[in-house]
């Protein structure tokens, strides 16, 4: 009888070790994704944060795995304690990331100093990564002691990782917030402890894990309120926040002004005349305004401005259905009513996918967010403009706007705008750029006019009610010295073309972002997009030769050889993964949802 009981207990322990490995894999991937999404929002959607986060997470897991390599064999009770500590630390970590700007003295809408951001990333990633690495080392060690192999342990842990990756994508697709996903992740982790504690009648651990699980269940029930509370730390006039497959959409409202933030970056606001300037100045270039295609941003004033014109049909393509669903009940009446107008046909689709259909339009207006990320850059590339050109009628026009500078263009801004200009010109021969704090790009297959008398005549004939645009304003825009200066600046650029596989615009946008922390980069001629100068190239070449030389000299040392080969494999693998992630974001724009599947 004793022998049977012993065999039964051993089998239960083997089963528990398998469950532990699956749980560690599940937590490592799903937990990592939840933290990455939170960091992405906390640092305004700059994909560079993903790259730095991967590095710090790997450092944390490596340290944890190294600590766990010692001869110490953890008891099951110790595994349970680390499981519970990981769950608690994980929730605290999310709260820390949500409040990171306030904790480090940041201002609303401003960036933290670069060193502070790095410090924040270290705090957010190293401890939890260390515990994940330690848990894998310990659970794998216990599994191997049951006459199993390390390869099998890794395979089982990978099964958990796949489950975590799938859940990270599916949960967000089902409308579950990232904070709720984080609570689900920790609940699964704690449930494993409860399940295994019941098997061996470990009363203290059973009690502790049950209490933690009850607290997590309460948090899950209050998750929406807590989510809004934490979001309000950075958005005092918050009315709605929702996690979508593309980003986190946050809506604030104050004094009849509604603002939309995507990954905490202001994308649109309702009390502005920018939509009037964009729509009316662009459409003056054509007499044909029967059919219009609006790609994004229609709710930000573009649709009401278009309805002032004698238009027969407006196809409004919105990539983010969740955004419209959350926003409609908070829009001013004139904007909400415009979206319900009989002439307006709202289509929920990716603009690049929609442009594959053989529809033709007199006007295409692009209202997508600024090209501040790889996600947005895909709407300012050569390939995108080719699609737009194919959807235009013979005398149709394409127009979009990007944030710029009215008086001084730095080298980075010049090259960024020029990259977009030449991408546009590769598909539509005639291009005009209107100066201002916001530059309006207008392009067409047919000739565009700069005759202010003709443009003013069209404006008067349309009998429009406007706050800014007038014959005087039209004359000012087309005749001031900035109009000519833009041509000269673009002509002096490197003539790079922004494309899907050569996103020069995104590279310069990253440079513009870095100049906020390192002002001297403002004077760099062409950062991130050109090869190093000859002197620096020689130095780089010498460093590579030196590295190879050291490896050849020490190649007889088995330890050195292993270290170098593992380092090279890890470096190459990480580089390829980063490139693939950025390409995926640039091509599809849904990294926020699919990051788990990509890092798995």
Give the predicted meaning of each segment:
Residues 2-452, 456-468, 479-600:
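Alpha-helical transmembrane segments of multi-pass membrane proteins
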């Amino acid at each position: 009888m004793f022998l049977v009981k012993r065999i039964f207990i051993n089998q239960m322990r083997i089963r528990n070790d398998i469950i532990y490995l699956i749980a560690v894999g599940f937590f490592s991937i799903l937990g990592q994704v939840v933290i990455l999404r939170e960091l992405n929002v906390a640092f305004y959607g700059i994909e560079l944060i993903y790259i730095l986060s991967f590095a710090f997470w790997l450092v944390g897991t490596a340290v944890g795995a190294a600590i766990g390599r010692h001869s110490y064999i953890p008891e099951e009770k110790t595994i349970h304690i680390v499981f519970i500590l990981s769950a608690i630390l994980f929730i605290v970590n999310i709260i820390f990331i949500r409040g990171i700007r306030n904790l480090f003295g940041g201002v609303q809408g401003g960036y933290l100093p670069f060193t502070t951001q790095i410090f924040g990333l270290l705090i957010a990633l190293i401890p939890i990564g260390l515990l994940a690495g330690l848990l894998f080392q310990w659970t794998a060690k216990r599994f191997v002691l049951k006459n199993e192999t390390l390869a099998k342990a890794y395979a089982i842990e990978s099964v958990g990782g796949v489950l975590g990756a799938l859940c990270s994508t599916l949960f967000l697709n089902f409308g579950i917030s990232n904070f709720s996903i984080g609570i689900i992740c920790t609940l699964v982790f704690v449930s494993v402890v409860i399940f295994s504690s019941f098997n061996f009648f470990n009363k203290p651990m059973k009690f502790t894990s049950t209490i933690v699980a009850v607290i997590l269940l309460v948090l899950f029930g209050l998750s929406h309120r807590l989510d809004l509370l934490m979001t309000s730390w950075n958005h005092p006039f918050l009315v709605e926040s929702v996690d979508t497959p593309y980003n986190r959409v946050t809506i604030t409202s104050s004094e009849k002004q509604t603002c939309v933030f995507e990954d905490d970056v202001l994308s649109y606001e309702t009390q502005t005349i920018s939509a009037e300037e964009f729509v009316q100045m662009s459409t003056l270039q054509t007499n044909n305004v029967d059919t219009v295609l609006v790609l994004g941003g229609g709710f930000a004033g573009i649709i009401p401005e278009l309805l002032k014109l004698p238009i027969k049909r407006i196809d409004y393509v919105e990539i983010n259905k969740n955004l419209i669903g959350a926003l409609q009940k908070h829009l001013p009446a004139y904007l909400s009513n415009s979206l319900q107008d009989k002439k307006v046909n709202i289509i929920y689709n990716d603009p690049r996918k929609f442009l594959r259909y053989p529809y033709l339009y007199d006007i295409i207006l692009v209202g997508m967010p600024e090209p501040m990320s790889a996600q947005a850059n895909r709407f300012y590339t050569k390939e995108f403009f080719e699609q737009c050109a194919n959807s235009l009628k013979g005398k149709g026009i394409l127009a979009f706007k990007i944030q710029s500078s009215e008086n001084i263009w730095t080298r980075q801004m010049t090259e960024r705008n020029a990259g977009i200009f030449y991408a546009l010109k590769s598909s539509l021969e005639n291009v005009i750029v209107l100066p201002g704090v916001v530059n309006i790009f207008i392009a067409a297959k047919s000739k565009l006019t700069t005759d202010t008398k003709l443009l003013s005549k069209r404006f008067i004939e349309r009998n429009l009610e406007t706050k800014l645009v007038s014959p005087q304003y039209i004359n000012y825009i087309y005749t001031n010295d900035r109009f000519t200066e833009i041509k000269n600046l673009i002509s002096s650029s490197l003539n790079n073309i922004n494309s899907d596989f050569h996103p020069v615009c995104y590279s310069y946008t990253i440079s513009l972002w870095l100049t906020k922390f390192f002002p001297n980069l403002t004077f760099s001629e062409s950062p991130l997009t050109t090869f190093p100068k000859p002197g620096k190239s020689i130095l780089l070449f010498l460093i590579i030769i030196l590295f190879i030389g050291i490896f050849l000299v020490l190649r007889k040392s088995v330890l050195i050889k292993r270290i170098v080969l593992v380092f090279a494999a890890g470096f190459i693998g990480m580089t390829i993964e980063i490139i693939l992630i950025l390409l995926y974001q640039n091509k599809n724009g849904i990294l926020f949802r699919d990051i788990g599947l990509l890092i798995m």
